[in-house]
Curated annotation (Swiss-Prot):
It comes from Mus musculus. The lineage of its organism: Eukaryota, Metazoa, Chordata, Craniata, Vertebrata. GO terms for molecular function: deacetylase activity; heparan sulfate N-deacetylase activity; heparan sulfate N-sulfotransferase activity; N-acetylglucosamine deacetylase activity; sulfotransferase activity. Monomer. Interacts with heparan sulfate co-polymerase subunits EXT1 and EXT2. Essential bifunctional enzyme that catalyzes both the N-deacetylation and the N-sulfation of glucosamine (GlcNAc) of the glycosaminoglycan in heparan sulfate. Modifies the GlcNAc-GlcA disaccharide repeating sugar backbone to make N-sulfated heparosan, a prerequisite substrate for later modifications in heparin biosynthesis. Plays a role in determining the extent and pattern of sulfation of heparan sulfate. Participates in biosynthesis of heparan sulfate that can ultimately serve as L-selectin ligands, thereby playing a role in inflammatory response. Inhibited by long N-sulfated sequences (more than 6 sugar residues) accumulating in its substrates heparan sulfate, and heparin. It holds the Pfam family Sulfotransfer_1. This is Bifunctional heparan sulfate N-deacetylase/N-sulfotransferase 1. The gene is Ndst1. Belongs to the sulfotransferase 1 family. NDST subfamily.
Length: 882
């Protein structure tokens, strides 16, 4: 108070002129403070006058000094979040959003996309105290900045609590302010700029793959760039660039030398402002360096949980050695260049070796100069790796006789032995990838018989495009690796005649598709051809420049391995890919073209009865077989009427094995095949596998009270002399604790787990559309089968219908409905069906009623959502629950 009184007395003694003078001094001081705040970072980025120039003749960028000490930020807590990325996009079809997703998919990172809410609900961020997302990405950072207060606070608190970072993109448009402060942040944006000469801040802590030793000379794509500016210590520039013209950025001053300053196009927020780490991009991902830094940003903000190791394995296959018309083959100088380039590449890739695939029939079929090239190549036989094609370069799927295929291979092997070519590499490639996928069984058997093949590769699994989805699998003891293209094909042999111009090839190499293939794949097998190594030798040009570019801009450790070791490394990294996923060959034209013409997709079933077990599936199987247009599978010698293909070891026998259970259709329009395997229902793998091979199939499931189903399974096991079922009562089985023996727990699971109906149907709904699935009332099927069969026929859409009221009759001795034959006789199921056994004890009934209560409630909700009628037993159960 005394101080305030003194101030009042002082003011009374000041003249108006003195007050104005003091105001002027205060304003001048404010201007100096503002100038320091605005320009401090920018001046810190200017190259020092005495800095030594780099190899490219450009002064190295100087990162700004932090004005405040670093404060502790919540560390990434990998154990507290799932390795899932939440991507907020403008729309499902926006280009930048798709590019972000493509990089995540290529890296095999799991993600979830959401339309960015301006207002409205935010996705659930936690589940039982665990964070659902390890990283948040905003296609448009303004959608994050302008979130309503509730959602913004919700998201920010989540990021702070779980150590989750944010990546955002700012894409200027014609309505963007030239200069503005990002709302709520000590960060200024200057937009709609043209930039050039991009460099990397070597002090940036997020750099991992990116090597900061180069300057990308030239104009950056687009004129809608945004640069970031701040004097707060939380911001660290990552990428820096100059303005294209000599004009200064508006509002940054008219200093004549200011245009030469470096401006941040990507900035890292260290989290010192609000505890959240972020990486902000001043444009989209069209600029290749943004893609590289984006990969590093994902790695840094997730504590390297979402990152690949720095090791990259590269194998370059040269297909069609000795194959090719005159004028496209290698001559003596080309062979020498191949050998010299291999040695040159070994300076960056230890023991790099070209892998040569040959068809011996075409040896010495070129010009004299090309034949001399063949001879020189064979004189270098020990310098390269070798693998066989077919002798006459024929497509294997055209050979239906395995012995003929083996004869062709034997001719190629004889040629190899005669010319000293090693035959024990264990790797082969089929011409045009024929027979590898879709699988031609004869090819796999002949490969093993003649060559002892252990590894092959293809670009066709699961599909040619998009390339980022290509995967590996193992079939019949042969490891199949994904193969990549590199922009070179049999017809691309001259640099100046490259499609789109030579600059297109350079673009693919220097930060383009080929560069990204290596960046985002730990293992890359590249397909090239003999013709790419003659004439302008584009194959050598491509890989020399690619390796140089990778060495200049990345910290990747380039390596190579022979094919068998490479395959072992691949499945060590991607062990989840060992099991194949068979698809309908007729759904992909390329697959159909390399699939045997003797095979037809019409042999696949159009209906699956999936179970679960002990609900009446065998009766339904019998009733469907009575329809003239419906045909069931042939019986299995092991599993009787059930094929059990999609859920177990039979799946690895392939689709040829599966099709053998169905006849070749006489009428593809009316013939309707179906199969019943009751253990498909609760299988974790069957829905996905079935949807891949039979995407248009109809699915039938029969449900009875899960308590009755559990008891029926227990009695079924007793009837088959299961020692565990004979030893323990039903009540002991279903109430067994976690310390019970493994065999007892296994029986308990088979009694109880299939009764989690909603859980299993949800899994099938994730693979098939709801209108492809029909859930039948098992109790009604037992009492009124004709009524149920009318529903089934309508669901299947069969052209002719059967009146089951006239074809079914109740057999009082059996106690269920049977097929009515001529003369009033009936054909019923075997002795094992309809077995009589004691009633379930009341304690077990009460236990199961309580055990399945929540499952049944979820089932009722799910069936309502699917638009299907609730089974009578479920309605009764829910009424009694109330």
């Amino acid at each position: 108070m005394p101080a305030l009184a003194c101030l009042r007395r002082l003011c009374r003694h000041l003249s108006p002129q003195a007050v104005l003078f003091l105001l002027f001094v205060f304003c001048l001081f404010s201007v100096f403070v503002s100038a320091y705040y605005l320009y401090g970072w920018n001046r810190g980025l200017e190259p020092s006058a005495d800095a030594s120039e780099s190899d490219c003749g450009d002064p190295p960028p100087v990162a700004p000094s932090r004005l405040l000490p670093i404060k502790p930020v919540q560390a990434v807590a990998p154990s507290r979040t799932d390795p899932l990325v939440l991507v907020f996009v403008e729309s499902l079809y926006s280009q930048l959003g798709q590019e972000v997703v493509a990089i995540l998919e290529s890296s095999r990172f799991k993600y979830r996309t959401e339309i960015a809410p301006g207002k409205g609900d935010m996705p659930t961020l936690t589940d039982k105290g665990r964070g659902r997302f390890a990283l948040i990405i905003y296609e448009n950072i303004l959608k994050y900045v302008n979130l309503d207060a509730w959602n913004r606070e919700l998201l920010d608190k989540y990021c702070v609590a779980y150590g989750v970072g944010i990546i955002g993109f700012f894409k200027a448009n014609e309505n963007s302010l030239l200069s503005a402060q990002l709302k709520g942040f000590p960060l200024f944006l200057h937009s709609n700029l043209g930039l050039k000469d991009c460099s990397i801040n070597p002090k940036s802590p997020l750099l991992y793959v990116t090597r900061p030793s180069e300057v990308e000379k030239g104009v950056l794509p687009g004129e809608d760039w945004t640069v970031f500016q701040s004097n707060h210590s939380t911001y660290e520039p990552v990428l820096l660039a100059k303005t294209r013209s000599s004009e200064s950025i508006p509002h940054l001053g008219a200093d004549a030398g200011l245009h030469a300053a470096l401006h941040a196009t990507v900035v890292q927020d260290l989290g010192l402002h609000d505890g959240i780490q972020r990486v902000l991009f001043g444009n989209n991902l069209n600029f290749w360096l943004h893609k590289l830094v984006f990969v590093d940003a994902v790695a840094f903000l997730t504590g390297k949980r979402l990152s690949l190791p720095l090791d990259r394995y590269i194998l370059v296959d040269i297909d069609d050695i000795f194959v090719g018309k005159e004028g496209t083959r290698m001559k003596v100088e080309d062979v020498k260049a191949l050998f010299d380039t291999q040695n040159e590449l070994r300076t960056h890739i230890p023991n790099f070796t070209f892998n040569l695939g040959y068809s011996g029939k075409f040896f010495h079929t070129g010009t004299d100069a090309e034949d001399a090239g063949d001879d020189l190549l064979l004189s270098y036989v020990k310098e390269f790796w070798w693998f066989p094609h077919m002798w006459s370069h024929m497509q294997p799927h055209l050979f239906h006789n395995q012995s003929v295929l083996a004869e062709q291979m034997a001719l190629n092997k004889k040629f190899a032995v005669e010319h000293g070519i090693p035959t024990d590499m264990g790797y082969a490639v089929a011409p045009h990838h024929s027979g590898v996928y879709p699988v031609h069984v004869q090819l796999y058997e002949a490969w093993k018989q003649v060559w002892g093949i252990r590894v092959t590769s293809t670009e066709e699994y699961p599909h040619l495009k998009p390339a980022r989805y290509r995967r590996g699998f193992i079939h019949n003891g042969i490891m199949v690796l994904p193969r990549q293209t590199c922009g070179l094909f049999t017809h691309t042999i001259f640099y100046n005649e490259y499609p789109g111009g030579s600059s297109e090839l350079d673009k693919i190499i220097n930060g383009g598709e080929l560069f990204l293939t290596v960046l985002l794949n730990p293992i890359s097998i590249f397909m090239t051809h003999l013709s790419n190594y003659g004439n302008d030798r584009l194959g050598l040009y491509t890989f020399k420049h690619l390796v140089r570019f990778l060495h200049s801009w990345t910290n990747l450790r380039l390596q190579t391995l022979p094919p068998v070791q490479l395959a072992q490394k691949y499945f060590q990294i991607f062990s989840e890919e060992k099991d194949p996923l068979w698809q309908d060959p007729c759904e992909d034209k390329r697959h159909k073209d390399i699939w045997s013409k003797e095979k037809t997709c019409d042999r696949f079933p159009k209906l699956l009865i999936i179970g679960p077990q002990k609900t009446g599936t065998t009766a339904l199987y019998l009733f469907l077989g009575m329809h003239p247009d419906l045909s069931s599978n042939y019986p299995s010698s092991e599993t009787f009427e059930e094929i059990q293909f999609f859920n177990g070891h039979n799946y690895h026998k392939g689709i040829d094995w599966y099709m053998e259970f169905f006849p070749i259709p006489s009428n593809t329009t009316s013939d309707f095949y179906f199969e019943k395997s009751a253990n498909y229902f609760d299988s974790e793998v069957a829905p996905r596998r079935a949807a891949a091979l039979l995407p248009k199939a109809k699915i039938l499931s029969i449900l009875i009270n899960p308590a009755d189903r559990a008891y029926s399974w227990y009695q079924h096991q007793r009837a088959h002399d299961d020692p565990v079922a004979l030893k323990y009562t039903f009540h002991e089985v279903i109430t067994a604790g976690p310390d019970a023996s493994s065999k007892l727990r296994a029986l308990q699971n088979r009694c109880l787990v299939p009764g989690w109906y909603a859980t299993h149907i949800e899994r099938w709904l994730s693979a098939f559309h709801a209108n492809q699935i029909l859930v039948l009332d098992g109790k009604l099927l037992r009492t009124e089968p004709a009524k149920v069969m009318d529903t089934v026929q309508k669901f299947l859409g069969v052209t002719s219908t059967v009146d089951y009221h006239k074809t079914l009759a109740f057999d009082p001795k059996k106690g269920f409905w049977c097929q009515l034959l001529e003369g009033g006789k009936t054909k019923c199921l075997g002795k094992s069906k309809g077995r009589k056994y004691p009633e379930m004890d009341l304690d077990s009934r009460a236990f199961l009623k309580d055990y399945f209560r929540d499952h049944n409630i979820e089932l009722s909700k799910l069936l309502y959502k699917m638009g299907q009628t609730l089974p009578t037993w479920l309605r009764e159960d829910l009424q009694n629950t109330r």
